[in-house]
Structure formats: C-alpha cells, structure tokens
C-alpha cells in the first residue's frame, strides 16, 4: 500500500481500490518537513514537523455521489504528496464513504450524515456500512484533535454538493452552538472561498459538523459547494476560490480576509425543520424546485395524514426538500432572513 501511494500520489485511487480497509496503518516522511500517516482507507494525516496553531479537518464523500469535493480534496492531497505545497498546519483528510463512491450513489443503506454523535450505535445498532464507518470517522476525529496540545484552533469543513439547483450556489450550515459566539473570521473565510451564504441552525443534529463543533469546540461547517455531478464531470473552475483558500489555510499563507460585514454575505436563520410522520407525505410544489425558494405566508407546503403543512412566516424559504425519506426523518429545512446573530 505504501509503495502504491508513493508511486501514484493518488490517495483517492488507493482508497477506492480498497474501499473497506487498507490493512495496517502506515506512515512515511516528506522531505524533512512533514510526517504522513495513513490510518485507514480514506483517512490521511499530514503532520508538519513545525506545526502552526491550527488543526484542520477536510472531509468529503460522506455522500458517495457528491463528487466535486472528493476531487477537490484529492487535488490538495496530491499536491501535498508531490510537495508542490507544504503543510504548515496539522491536517486530516477524510474520504467518508468509499463504498458509496464506488457505487456512484448517495448512500449504500442509510444517510451517513444523520449518524454522528453516537447515533450510529443507537437501535438498530451497527447494522450497515454507513453506521460502521460513521463510528470509525468519529474515532479518527477524536484521535486527531486529541493528538495535539490543547488550546489550538480546531477547524472542520465537511464538504458536500446538493442534489438540486440553488438560488445561492454555494452555502454553509453553521451548527447550533449555544453559549458560543459565531466566528466573524470563519464567515469571511467562507465568503473568500466563494461560499457567500450561511444558515444558522437552531437545534442539535446528528451531522458530522455538529459532532465536531459540539464535542471538540471546533469551528465546523457543513459546506455545500454546488450541485451533484458524476465523477469527472464537474467544472472544477467553479471551485478555484475554495481550493485556493483551503490551500492557504493548510500552508499558513496570509488569508487576507475582509472585515466581517453582514451586507457582504447572505445570512439565514433556520426557523423549523419539518419531519415525516406518515407514508403519504408529499410536497405541493414541483420536485425540481431550487434551494432557497421562498413562499408566501399561508402557502400549503405539504400534506400528510390528512393535514396541511403551511408556511408560517413572511419570507420563509426552504432548502433540502426530500419527501422520499423514512418516517421520522427530515423532509425540509425552513429558513428566514437573519440579521447577524452574535458574530465576533
């Protein structure tokens, strides 16, 4: 495995050729500046000999068909392995769901991004590949963040693409973080990366980014970088800004961020989440409606169990509508425009 990676510098190819395991962990050094550790398939760490003050996680492929972030991360990994760029921050790359990537599908059995914060082991337990992998990914995050001295800034960007078109092509979900201010620097980093829209979540979830935020105090985000396309069919020029900013972060180059101003970004507050309670749940709007579509107050969004679900507030908009989820799961997130909350 080691020689294959040293020869190809293609960690994604190695991962997809061995989607369940790489066998034993292995490590090697790049020049005299970086120790590289491979902990598992899709799990690679860059440890600078003289690390600066940030611990950075870039995860992708939690959903197997969201390919642009996978290609983006593999490009960064390849540049690091080729020593075209040199890591100055401790950096962990996670390719989340290799089995689903090989399958060309969002999932194998279950939505992995609903299985963190221990949800993977709640009944029915570790019964499918996503649950097993989510538990492992949690352990790798724990090992990485605890592998350095306390007091360092912890960052986790969980990269995705959306199943539908969007009024705002690139957007981020800021996990619920009671008692902690939102980071002005992080919001402006996202803006510089081309992610000009931020949703502030209103409650705990079982997403990967919430796990890192809540358990480790990380500046963590679920970041949607555009629309789903098959592997190799992404227009990677649309991700130049994001790739450049991630590279600057990892290599400790100046970020040159603008000061925070609410008029430079689109801010939304999650006002409610609508879950599915009956098999007959259906939306009233077209299946191809774009993310951030708004509806007038009183508009009937959906019907289930003989009841109507209506828009409750003026200027309420929606993201991630999906009626074809299991009972108990989220069908849509509802948003309202937000004045900047506690941003510092």
From Swiss-Prot:
Tell me which SUPFAM superfamilies the record gives.
Zn-dependent exopeptidases (SSF53187)
Top enzyme class? hydrolase
**Which coenzymes or cofactors are required?**
Zn(2+)
| TM ranges | none
* Keywords on record: Arginine metabolism, Hydrolase, Metal-binding, Zinc
Looking up CDD domains in the UniProt record yields:
M14_ASTE (cd03855)
Q: What is its EC number?
A: 3.5.1.96
User: Which Pfam family, just one, is annotated for this protein?
Assistant: AstE_AspA_hybrid
Keyword Hydrolase annotated: yes
Q: Which reaction does it catalyse?
A: N-succinyl-L-glutamate + H2O = L-glutamate + succinate
The function of this protein is: Transforms N(2)-succinylglutamate into succinate and glutamate.
Tell me what this protein is called.
Answer: Succinylglutamate desuccinylase
Q: Which organism is it from?
A: Shewanella sp. (strain MR-4)
Q: Species lineage, top-down? A: Bacteria, Pseudomonadati, Pseudomonadota, Gammaproteobacteria, Alteromonadales
What gene name is listed for this protein?
astE
